[in-house]
Amino acid sequence: MVAMAAGPSGCLVPAFGLRLLLATVLQAVSAFGAEFSSEACRELGFSSNLLCSSCDLLGQFNLLQLDPDCRGCCQEEAQFETKKLYAGAILEVCGUKLGRFPQVQAFVRSDKPKLFRGLQIKYVRGSDPVLKLLDDNGNIAEELSILKWNTDSVEEFLSEKLERI
């Protein structure tokens, strides 16, 4: 059985064609320097903490066709980063998976989150630990996987990025 979906002309086309169309559109958008949303990057198979230096390595593995998507999803390494405070942050975790990340669990269940203005703990089913930094309008400015961070790293990072109470 082949999955079918309505195409642009109303005709039924294989769902694979829609994925190909989506990939083509995303490549066209990336050619104009636009960044993809974190959801689109995950759909394309890229991590939320992908560094642009990783995209430079694609040629070594004959994967240059992935370069435009990689560039649309990557984050530049901060060479001369100025200290920027964000308006808030959301630490997303799955309550049922939290035990697999004892360091993040220790941070979430401690009093430390109360020390940071604008920090919210959000339980999202199935989510690995992710930290979303918010701009002044409440939009996601940065998204980082904190999968392997320890309690001190989370606290230190938040001390640099959020205002302490």
From Swiss-Prot:
Forms a tight complex with UGGT1/UGCGL1. Interacts with UGGT2/UGCGL2. Interacts with RDH11. The N-terminus is blocked. Keywords: Endoplasmic reticulum, Selenocysteine, Signal. The gene is SELENOF. SUPFAM superfamilies: Thioredoxin-like. The keyword NAD does not apply. GO terms for molecular function: oxidoreductase activity; selenium binding; thioredoxin peroxidase activity. GO terms for cellular component: endoplasmic reticulum lumen. It holds the Pfam family Sep15_SelM. May be involved in redox reactions associated with the formation of disulfide bonds. May contribute to the quality control of protein folding in the endoplasmic reticulum. May regulate protein folding by enhancing the catalytic activity of UGGT1/UGCGL1 and UGGT2/UGCGL2. Residues 1-31 form the signal peptide. Changing U96C: Does not affect protein folding and binding to UGGT1 or UGGT2. It comes from the Eukaryota. It comes from Homo sapiens (Human). It is found in: Endoplasmic reticulum lumen. Higher levels in prostate and thyroid gland. The keyword Signal applies. Belongs to the selenoprotein M/F family. This is Selenoprotein F. InterPro entries: Sep15/SelM_sf (IPR038219), Sep15_SelM (IPR039992), Sep15_SelM_dom (IPR014912), Thioredoxin-like_sf (IPR036249). GO terms for biological process: 'de novo' post-translational protein folding; sperm DNA condensation.
